[in-house]
Amino acid sequence: MERSFVMVKPDGVQRGLIGEVISRLERRGLKLVAAKLMRVSRELAEEHYAQLKDKPFFPSLIEFITSGPVMAMVWEGPNAISIIRKTMGATNPANAEPGTIRADFACDVSYNVVHGSDGPESAEREIRLWFGEVEPSYSRSVDRWIFPEG
């Protein structure tokens, strides 16, 4: 089973979209295995977005992510990363497919509601950074109908 980190950003939390994000991911068959509502320290934000440190928008990104609470989550399922990325839509909501989270709710590229890991390596790094060790997975009674191969 693949795991991915997902964060509802401060704009999504302020607008009451946590439930919408969770609902959409659950309807795609994914399983929520860890979650916490939290305020992000400057240190955590800078470490999370370290690969963007040299970008001109880095200071405003850190300011935004630390401006209010976020909902940090770990999701699990076959092809979880690609399913989550398709469900979120393009980073820039102007380019997001209709029916995706960002097309439906994001205001612009800076306030785009949600973050999701972009690959297995970043998922592992982000999950460890935000959660440390995540408990082993649990089984749902419906898993054998949703994922018949495994």
Swiss-Prot record:
It catalyses: a 2'-deoxyribonucleoside 5'-diphosphate + ATP = a 2'-deoxyribonucleoside 5'-triphosphate + ADP; a ribonucleoside 5'-diphosphate + ATP = a ribonucleoside 5'-triphosphate + ADP. It is an enzyme of class 2 (transferase). Its cofactor is Mg(2+). The keyword DNA repair does not apply. It is found in: Cytoplasm. ATP binds at residues 9, 57, 85, 91, 102, 112. The active site is at 115 (pros-phosphohistidine intermediate). Belongs to the NDK family. Major role in the synthesis of nucleoside triphosphates other than ATP. The ATP gamma phosphate is transferred to the NDP beta phosphate via a ping-pong mechanism, using a phosphorylated active-site intermediate. This is Nucleoside diphosphate kinase. It comes from Symbiobacterium thermophilum (strain DSM 24528 / JCM 14929 / IAM 14863 / T). The lineage of its organism: Bacteria, Bacillati, Bacillota, Clostridia, Eubacteriales. The gene is ndk.
